[in-house]
């Protein structure tokens, strides 16, 4: 058991609470980056490299027949083992987008190809569902059960927005627990069925789900209706072989009071290490537990925890995911350290000694942090071919700077003024910022102060402007002065722009005869005047 600090090399801002770690073909991938994908990695999926205490990300491309996979926070995902000629992959359901929209789609992510220089290409497909489908949600779990050669998925828990009939302007962004229903998804035909069990009376989210054969064990979780983390463990059995699934549920003791925890598998058996998470809203769970699934059920025993550092102990938030082989990645925000450029500090926790076999991680559980915090074409293959290279030499050669993600290659948003410190009491932090006005989406609203040489931009929220006043100032032509320069919304009127009118002389028509000018004598004029009178 060890705890090793990691240095994120120009990629620390991409990891956020609610991200997921996937394991395919011996590699680790990051899914659910912060914000929308940028030019350097349009897929939003990165390969994770840990070497010499450094954490690096490598952009991953997708095949031509792949669908778009948005970066989802707190989705439910489960690993698919190779079965009947189908490759290994991951099923991803639900989650929140960077625009705080909640998804209800089901995606299948598999490995499409691997180039000679270890470049990985993924394939993403959206699966169509019919029947009683699970609605949009996040913070839920997706588990794989199998019996007599047939497989099915179990969806349970999560949170979602209030129903459309109850959603108003005041509670537009309020979330509620999803009804305590269990959804069974037949992967072969995409048929869904919903089941209501008397043992499941309250909705729960950010729990753990561990599966073995046709059993699924739900550990811990948080309920908004109860406002605490009740100690509970449920076992769910799904009889999937014939006809409609027969679902049964039972309660187990001892139980666990935990939410947003990480489960990493140790060895080829169904043994898991539970670490991280929260016992209360403001209290982290510093203990570790060993969970073993066998024919008799589930056994939970305490396990020695690593020597947590002072940064981990005193920080209020942590997140991460399983990296397989008895190891996990933990990240903590750099709270109260404005001088440090890193947004997060990262650690690798290993529970397996060197030399022990690394088993396949058949059940993937990633961190689903309940606290809502809220780019160039894909890199092309190198033209250099590798012949007669050793595996370790090939791995070292792929660590070049050409295919490693670097934040310095992206556009510097600080130059645009969105995340600058506009005043001494600036309240906008790019790591914890949330929309304040209804017109805000991805960046804070700003207003221009006309004082000083050239003026400067300030955040509307820091200037304590109401939304109505902000709209009027943006639509009018009045000058604004920030609180440091008088705080007057309209002191002067912007002078209207003087547009010089252009004198356009008519073009002289060519080859055109003008009207005939007839000269009339005064006698003829008098004659015509008397004639018409």
Curated annotation (Swiss-Prot):
Biased composition regions of type Basic residues, renumbered to the chain: 505-517
Record has Thylakoid as a keyword: no
Residues that bind Zn(2+) 2: 449, 456, 482, 485
Region of interest called Disordered, as start-end residue ranges on this chain: 358-413, 496-517
Acidic residues composition bias: residue spans: 371-384, 396-413
Binding site for Zn(2+) 1: 422, 426, 459, 462
InterPro entries on file: Gal_Oxase/kelch_b-propeller (IPR011043), Kelch-typ_b-propeller (IPR015915), RAG2 (IPR004321), RAG2_PHD (IPR025162), Znf_FYVE_PHD (IPR011011)
Localisation: Nucleus
Bias (Basic and acidic residues) ranges: 386-395
Gene Ontology CC entries for this record: DNA recombinase complex; nucleus
Predominant cellular place of this UniProt entry's protein: nucleus
PANTHER family noted in UniProt: V D J RECOMBINATION-ACTIVATING PROTEIN 2 (PTHR10960), V(D)J RECOMBINATION-ACTIVATING PROTEIN 2 (PTHR10960:SF0)
Family listed: Belongs to the RAG2 family.
Role played: Core component of the RAG complex, a multiprotein complex that mediates the DNA cleavage phase during V(D)J recombination. V(D)J recombination assembles a diverse repertoire of immunoglobulin and T-cell receptor genes in developing B and T lymphocytes through rearrangement of different V (variable), in some cases D (diversity), and J (joining) gene segments.
Quaternary assembly: Component of the RAG complex composed of core components rag1 and rag2.
Protein name: V(D)J recombination-activating protein 2
Organism: Oncorhynchus mykiss
UniProt lineage: Eukaryota, Metazoa, Chordata, Craniata, Vertebrata
């Amino acid at each position: 058991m060890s705890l090793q600090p990691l240095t994120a090399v120009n990629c620390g801002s991409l990891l956020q609470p609610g991200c997921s770690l996937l394991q395919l073909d011996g590699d680790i991938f990051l899914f659910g980056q912060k914000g929308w994908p940028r030019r350097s990695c349009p897929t939003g999926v990165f390969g994770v490299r840990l070497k010499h205490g450094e954490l690096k990300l490598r952009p991953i491309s997708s095949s031509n027949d792949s669908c778009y996979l948005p970066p989802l926070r707190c989705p439910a995902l489960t690993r698919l083992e190779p079965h009947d000629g189908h490759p290994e992959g991951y099923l991803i359901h639900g989650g929140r987008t960077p625009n705080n929209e909640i998804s209800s789609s089901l995606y299948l992510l598999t490995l499409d190809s691997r180039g000679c220089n270890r470049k990985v290409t993924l394939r993403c497909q959206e699966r169509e569902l019919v029947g009683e489908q699970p609605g949009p949600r996040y913070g839920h779990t997706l588990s794989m059960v199998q019996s007599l050669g047939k497989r099915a998925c179990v969806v349970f828990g999560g949170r979602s927005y209030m129903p459309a009939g109850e959603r108003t302007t005041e509670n537009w962004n309020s979330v509620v627990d999803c009804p305590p229903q269990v959804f069974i998804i037949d992967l072969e035909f995409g048929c869904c069925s919903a089941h209501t069990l008397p043992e499941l009376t309250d909705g729960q989210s950010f729990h753990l789900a561990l599966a073995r054969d046709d059993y699924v064990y739900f550990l811990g979780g948080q309920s908004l209706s109860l406002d605490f983390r009740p100690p509970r463990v449920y076992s769910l059995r799904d009889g999937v072989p014939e006809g409609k699934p027969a679902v049964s549920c039972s309660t187990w003791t001892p139980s666990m009071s935990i939410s947003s925890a990480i489960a990493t598998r140790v060895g080829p058996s169904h043994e898991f290490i539970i670490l991280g998470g929260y016992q209360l809203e403001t209290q982290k769970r510093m203990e570790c537990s060993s969970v073993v699934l066998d024919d008799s059920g589930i056994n939970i025993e305490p396990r020695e925890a690593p020597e947590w550092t002072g940064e981990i102990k005193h920080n209020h938030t942590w997140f991460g995911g399983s990296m397989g082989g008895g190891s996990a990645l933990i990240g903590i925000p750099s709270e109260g350290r404005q001088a440090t450029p890193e947004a997060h500090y990262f650690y690798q926790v290993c529970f397996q000694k060197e030399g022990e076999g690394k088993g396949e991680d058949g059940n993937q559980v990633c961190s689903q942090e309940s606290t809502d915090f809220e780019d160039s074409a894909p890199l092309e293959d190198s033209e250099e071919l590798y012949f007669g290279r050793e595996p370790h030499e090939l791995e070292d050669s792929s660590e070049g700077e050409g295919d490693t993600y670097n934040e310095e290659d992206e556009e510097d948003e600080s130059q645009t003024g969105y995340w600058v410190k506009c005043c001494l009491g600036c309240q906008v932090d790019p790591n914890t910022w949330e929309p304040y006005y209804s017109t805000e989406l991805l960046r804070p609203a700003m207003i221009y102060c006309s004082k000083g040489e050239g003026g400067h931009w300030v955040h509307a929220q820091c200037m304590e402007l109401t939304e109505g006043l902000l709209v009027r100032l943006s639509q009018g032509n009045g000058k604004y002065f920030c609180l440091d320069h008088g705080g007057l919304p309209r002191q002067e009127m912007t002078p209207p722009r003087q547009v010089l009118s252009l004198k356009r002389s008519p073009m002289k028509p060519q080859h055109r005869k003008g009207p005939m000018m007839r000269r009339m004598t005064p006698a003829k004029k008098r004659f015509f005047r008397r004639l018409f009178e």
